[in-house]
């Protein structure tokens, strides 16, 4: 190695030694997500509180990873669950199989399923990574592990991201502010 090459390599090292780090201190500082980020699935509702999902199973048919299971049922006219003739009695998404491509969102004729902003879904049990309808409704804050940790500690659900723009499809979804709180 020549003296010139040694000086160049030391110069590069010194340049990066005193520059701003590229890495983000993720757990301590919230991460700014982009508007088209694909995260945890959210099942939306109409303004009157009825579910938008009509149990048509088009999202399951569009899913290339076969991660979605929908079991439709007839809607009771006296006590409707959704605005259509049917509703999703069982709606499950296996988050281990899901590739977060967004094809389910595109296939949905009512705009019921939207890919939200939650991405912290690591868990220990396989069964905890199969999200049911009650885990994905729009008024549910955080993922299963986040809710379990909040229940254990008695603190509110803490999310590690900041969304500068909230998609209009996520009606009722409270995006966190700059401090990382909703």
Curated annotation (Swiss-Prot):
Known cofactor(s): [4Fe-4S] cluster
Subcellular location as annotated: Cell membrane
GO MF assignments: 4 iron, 4 sulfur cluster binding; iron ion binding; NADH:ubiquinone reductase (non-electrogenic) activity; quinone binding
EC number(s) reported in the record: 7.1.1.-
Cofactor binding mode and count: Binds 2 [4Fe-4S] clusters per subunit. The [4Fe-4S] clusters are referred to as N6a and N6b.
Sequence positions that bind [4Fe-4S] cluster 1: 53, 56-57, 59, 108
Main localization (coarse): membrane
Membrane topology term: Peripheral membrane protein
Entry binding sites for [4Fe-4S] cluster 2: 63, 98-99, 101, 104
Main EC class the enzyme belongs to: translocase
Recorded GO CC terms: plasma membrane
InterPro entries the UniProt entry points to: 4Fe4S_Fe-S-bd, 4Fe4S_Fe_S_CS, NADH_quinone_OxRdtase_chainI
Protein keywords: 4Fe-4S, Cell membrane, Iron, Iron-sulfur, Membrane, Metal-binding, NAD, Quinone, Repeat, Translocase
GO terms classed as biological process: aerobic respiration
Limits of the 4Fe-4S ferredoxin-type domain: 43-73, 89-118
Gene3D superfamilies given in the database record: 3.30.70.3270
A Pfam family per the record: Fer4_7
Reactions mediated catalytically: a quinone + NADH + 5 H(+)(in) = a quinol + NAD(+) + 4 H(+)(out)
Assigned protein family: Belongs to the complex I 23 kDa subunit family.
Function statement: NDH-1 shuttles electrons from NADH, via FMN and iron-sulfur (Fe-S) centers, to quinones in the respiratory chain. The immediate electron acceptor for the enzyme in this species is menaquinone. Couples the redox reaction to proton translocation (for every two electrons transferred, four hydrogen ions are translocated across the cytoplasmic membrane), and thus conserves the redox energy in a proton gradient required for the synthesis of ATP.
Assembly mode: NDH-1 is composed of 15 different subunits, Nqo1 to Nqo15. The complex has a L-shaped structure, with the hydrophobic arm (subunits Nqo7, Nqo8 and Nqo10 to Nqo14) embedded in the membrane and the hydrophilic peripheral arm (subunits Nqo1 to Nqo6, Nqo9 and Nqo15) protruding into the bacterial cytoplasm. The hydrophilic domain contains all the redox centers.
Protein's name according to its UniProt entry: NADH-quinone oxidoreductase subunit 9
Organism placement in taxonomy: Bacteria, Thermotogati, Deinococcota, Deinococci, Thermales
């Amino acid at each position: 190695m020549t003296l010139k090459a040694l000086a160049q390599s030391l110069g590069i090292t010194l340049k990066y030694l005193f520059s701003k780090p590229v890495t983000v201190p993720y757990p301590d500082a919230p991460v700014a997500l982009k508007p088209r980020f694909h995260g945890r699935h959210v099942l939306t509702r109409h303004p009157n509180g009825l579910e938008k999902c009509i149990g048509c199973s088009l999202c399951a048919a569009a899913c290339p990873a076969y991660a979605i299971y929908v079991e439709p049922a007839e809607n009771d006219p006296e006590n409707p669950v959704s605005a259509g003739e049917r509703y999703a009695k069982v709606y499950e998404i296996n988050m281990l199989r899901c590739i977060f491509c967004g094809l389910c969102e595109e296939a949905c004729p009512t705009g019921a399923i939207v890919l939200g902003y939650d991405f912290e879904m690591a868990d220990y049990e396989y069964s905890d990574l199969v999200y049911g309808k009650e885990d994905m409704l729009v008024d549910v804050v955080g993922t299963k592990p986040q809710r379990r940790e909040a229940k254990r500690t008695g603190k509110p659900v803490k999310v590690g991201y900041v969304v500068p723009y909230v998609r209009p499809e996520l009606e009722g979804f409270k995006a966190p502010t700059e401090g990382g709180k909703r």
